[in-house]
Amino acid sequence: MMSNLPLDLVEEILSRVPATSLKRLRSTCRQWNALLKDRRFTEKHFRKAPKESLVLMLKEISVNLNVTPPSIEFKDALGLKDSHSNSEQVDIVQVLHCDGLLLCTTKDNRHVVWNPCLGETHWIQFKVDYGRVYSSFALGYIQNNESCRSYKILWRWKSNDYKSSPRQRGFEIYEFISDKWRVIDDVNHDSLVNHNYLGRCCRVSLKGNIYWLVDDVEDNSRSLLMFDFKTERFKRLCLPHFENVGHMVLSFVREEQLSVLYWSRATPKMEIWITNNIDTDATLLWRLHLDTRFNCVRIFSSLYFEEEKKVVLCCNVKLLMMIRSARTWYTLSERTMDI
């Protein structure tokens, strides 16, 4: 029996258990519960456990197009309960993934960091300021040493004073260690004045830093903006050269490389580009990985990319009579497309 095994052997076995199975093992005994909470074990599990891919949908809506459906099955729905009230479920409207954690924004504009595998939550408190609009939050971390990470949240906001030009903007950092917010006074605001952030489908958190697709309103160009949580500074990075600005979705591959899904406004052309690295000190290089052409609705908001099989799962968001949104999943390859 497992209880008769040495603790180091138990740790070695559990470090290879898939993350989705760890939650129900915590109730086995106090010793296992303490082990699964240990940061050293978390790092070991991250290195040795088999990698799993989860597709998270906030709403499930079926649309029958009278065609053969793709071989995709959605199961094991995730549900977040509110520890601050008696409500059964929290209505989540936005999600950002970082290092196995989900930064969730609720319908009533509250924010929580959630570990869906372990069922742990951390609700974020901040002072509500109704003079600030266009708020957005991003989750990242700094690597203190080989086995310790300090998580932070970046809060980006603009004032609602339309008379001021440029409009006042600010950045604040929340640190989990201190459980406090602080203003970033020396961030390079000037380089950000003429940038428009392109929404939820154009930001990702990767290796502790946050990346956005941004438009430069002066020269009608598009670039990649990174926020380094260690230096707490912004850095502009290059994108591949495109025929026109077009539409883009930012994502990542195996939590190691950035990827951009691009489709032209003028032609049915669609491309997927992948970076060679995300080293903050090196020049960002892109390579074309997938090039295809097809006619369909191409306003995608998110994607899951499987590099070896050259398959991408795209989520398409459409407004139906301006009342509700429906989501249609497309599976693309170099030769075929299934809806």
UniProtKB/Swiss-Prot annotation:
<protein>
    <recommendedName>
        <fullName>F-box protein At3g22700</fullName>
    </recommendedName>
</protein>
<dbReference type="InterPro" id="IPR050796">
    <property type="entry name" value="SCF_F-box_component"/>
</dbReference>
<dbReference type="InterPro" id="IPR036047">
    <property type="entry name" value="F-box-like_dom_sf"/>
</dbReference>
<dbReference type="InterPro" id="IPR006527">
    <property type="entry name" value="F-box-assoc_dom_typ1"/>
</dbReference>
<dbReference type="InterPro" id="IPR001810">
    <property type="entry name" value="F-box_dom"/>
</dbReference>
<dbReference type="Pfam" id="PF07734">
    <property type="entry name" value="FBA_1"/>
</dbReference>
<feature type="domain" description="F-box">
    <location>
        <begin position="1"/>
        <end position="49"/>
    </location>
</feature>
<dbReference type="InterPro" id="IPR017451">
    <property type="entry name" value="F-box-assoc_interact_dom"/>
</dbReference>
<dbReference type="Pfam" id="PF00646">
    <property type="entry name" value="F-box"/>
</dbReference>
